[in-house]
């Protein structure tokens, strides 16, 4: 079968690899759509987290963990699944024509709701990640929530907030393209951090908060989501520091991004403000299922987020496109 394998930074090649064999109870999927995740980009761009890929014979690693497909073979029986079913699932190695679902993971094969495309279903995993971040924040109606980083995770958090709460939403990014998508999805306010100081803007929008023993004026957002992280080549104030400064006393900061280097932080401000800091990693299976239900019900529309699709043979071009924040939101590979 064909697969796109990673061999080093900026080096993804398509070639022939062995088609997965099946043990008793295993399910074989014909992959129909696979998204390129931010974690894939950390590997592709800088060689970080290389062990996330699945090794292949030629020495490369097949990435891709957010995908959908069609059941084409079952060795024996798998509860609730039959050949021909349209399903979405998770695992490592989705940048390939076929994917083996081990018997113990067949419970993670969820049927794609009628009327939902393979492409939309392939965005279920990142939506579940966004949902988990929002669940950690436990938003209450009437609050102000700030999302820094309007990639697939930040925009997903916006969609979850709009679908399930009545909070005021402010989205911050440097990409006009992504901010336009945020407005399309219902963001109450968008801020281009490349043209105006996001902290100053949040202070204007939420009102200033003067903290004793602290020399800076801070914002009063109830929750701030750091969906940007810290790239290796970034030299400004870390987004996490901005988030801490934007948040009100006893507010919440949810970190749902990967840091490519350690940030320099003013921890005293975190301590003085009594902020609750959450690390948000992945999701529970119930959240994964709920994310697909949100898509299937129409409460969340993922189509505006899918900006590019590429055949498997152009996987390298797909990865390069996903790096271009001004052009792309979610890039899918269609094996």
Kindly label every feature range from the protein language model.
Residues 18-35, 49-93, 113:
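Glycine-rich beta-strand-centered segment in the early N-terminal region that forms part
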Residues 89-148:
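NAD(P)H dinucleotide-binding glycine-rich loop of Rossmann-like/cofactor-binding domains
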Residues 140, 188-276:
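Glycine-rich cofactor phosphate-binding loops and adjacent beta1-alpha1 units
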Residues 154-155:
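N-terminal Rossmann-fold NAD(P) dinucleotide-binding loop
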Residues 163-168, 187:
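Conserved S-adenosyl-L-methionine
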Residues 173:
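Conserved acidic E/D residue at the C-terminus of a beta-strand in Rossmann-like folds
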Residues 212, 241, 285-335:
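C-terminal hydrophobic helical "lid"/dimerization subdomain
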Residues 249-255, 265-304:
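Rossmann-fold dehydrogenase core element
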């Amino acid at each position: 079968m064909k697969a796109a394998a990673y061999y080093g930074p900026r080096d993804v090649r398509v070639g022939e690899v062995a088609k997965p064999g099946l043990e008793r109870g295993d399910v074989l999927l014909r992959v129909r759509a696979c998204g390129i995740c931010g974690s894939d980009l950390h590997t592709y761009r800088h060689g970080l987290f290389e062990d996330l890929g699945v090794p292949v014979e030629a020495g490369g690693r097949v990435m891709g963990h957010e995908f959908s497909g069609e059941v084409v073979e079952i060795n024996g029986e798998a509860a609730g699944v039959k050949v021909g079913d349209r399903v979405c699932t998770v695992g490592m190695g989705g940048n390939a024509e076929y994917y083996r679902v081990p018997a113990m993971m067949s419970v993670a094969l969820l049927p794609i709701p009628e009327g939902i495309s393979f492409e939309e279903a392939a965005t279920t995993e990142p939506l579940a990640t966004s949902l988990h971040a929002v669940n950690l924040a436990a938003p209450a109606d009437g609050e102000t929530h700030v999302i820094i980083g309007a990639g697939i995770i930040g925009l997903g958090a916006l969609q979850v907030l709009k679908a399930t709460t009545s909070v005021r939403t402010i989205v911050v990014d440097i990409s006009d393209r992504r901010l336009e998508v945020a407005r399309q999805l219902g963001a109450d306010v968008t801020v281009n951090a490349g043209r105006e100081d996001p902290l100053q803007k949040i202070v204007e929008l939420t009102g200033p908060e003067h903290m004793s023993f602290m020399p800076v004026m801070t914002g009063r957002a109830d929750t701030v989501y750091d969906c940007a992280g810290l790239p290796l080549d970034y030299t400004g104030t870390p987004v996490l520091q901005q988030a801490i400064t934007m948040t009100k006393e006893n507010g919440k900061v949810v970190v749902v991004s990967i840091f490519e280097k350690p940030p320099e932080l003013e921890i005293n401000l975190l301590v003085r403000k009594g902020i609750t800091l959450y690390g948000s990693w992945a999701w529970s299976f119930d959240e994964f299922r709920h994310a697909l239900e949100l898509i299937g019900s129409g409460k969340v529309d993922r189509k505006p987020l899918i900006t590019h699709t590429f055949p498997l043979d152009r996987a390298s071009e797909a990865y390069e496109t996903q790096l271009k924040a001004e052009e792309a939101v979610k890039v899918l590979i269609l094996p």
